[in-house]
């Protein structure tokens, strides 16, 4: 007997691995089927989730930590500081709704950070934090933003680069 996990079929077993259970819960598969589309309907490459993260960067170029910091503190874009405090004495009025980002680079790997920024609802469906790169399935979006991610793939990588410096 086998069960389907995403596009993959795996043998049913009384002994499931943590990764298999996570993939089942998140609807992810370890590998996409041959001929799978390289982009979704909105032109956004699909996220390849493995275990509890996205191991591969979303872009061919490395993220820039300085640009990532600018995005995190920018009230008009990512606006992370609305809910999260960061260890920056120059920053005033950071939020405390979400966890502090101080030391996040020691607590989470880049792959885990990438998933949380790109599609946080996969990690915590009850979270108020938006999925910054996901567009599919979002139904309460203002018309000018419909079908567009909050952050581009390179901006996600910039944010991840900055978060990994917070040790």
Q: How should these model regions be labeled?
A:
Residues 66-81, 92-95, 146-154:
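Sequence context surrounding c-type heme c attachment/ligation sites in exported
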Residues 68, 77-87, 113, 129, ...:
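The canonical Cys-X-X-Cys-His
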Residues 73, 85-119, 128-142:
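Gly/Gly-Pro-rich "capping" loops immediately C-terminal to redox-active cysteine motifs
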Residues 122-125, 132-167:
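C-terminal capping alpha-helices of c-type cytochrome domains
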Residues 16-29:
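Bacterial N-terminal signal peptides
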Residues 30-41:
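Boundary at the C-terminal end of the N-terminal hydrophobic targeting segment
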Residues 1-13:
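N-terminal secretory signal peptides that target proteins for export/translocation
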Residues 41-75:
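Electrostatic cytochrome c docking/interface patches
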């Amino acid at each position: 007997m086998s069960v389907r996990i995403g596009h993959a079929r795996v043998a049913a077993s009384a002994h499931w691995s943590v990764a298999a259970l996570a993939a089942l819960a998140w609807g992810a598969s370890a590998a996409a089927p041959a001929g799978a589309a390289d982009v979704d309907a909105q032109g956004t490459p699909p996220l390849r989730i493995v275990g509890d993260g996205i191991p591969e960067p979303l872009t061919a170029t490395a993220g820039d930590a300085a640009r990532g910091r600018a995005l995190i503190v920018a009230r008009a874009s990512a606006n992370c500081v609305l809910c999260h405090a960061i260890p920056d004495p120059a920053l005033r009025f950071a939020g405390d709704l979400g966890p502090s980002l101080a030391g996040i680079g020691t607590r989470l790997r880049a792959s885990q950070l990438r998933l949380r920024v790109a599609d946080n609802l996969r990690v915590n469906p009850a979270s108020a934090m938006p999925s910054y790169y996901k567009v599919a399935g979002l139904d309460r979006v203002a018309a000018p933003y419909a079908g567009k991610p909050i952050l581009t793939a390179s901006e996600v990588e910039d944010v991840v680069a900055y978060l990994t410096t917070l040790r």
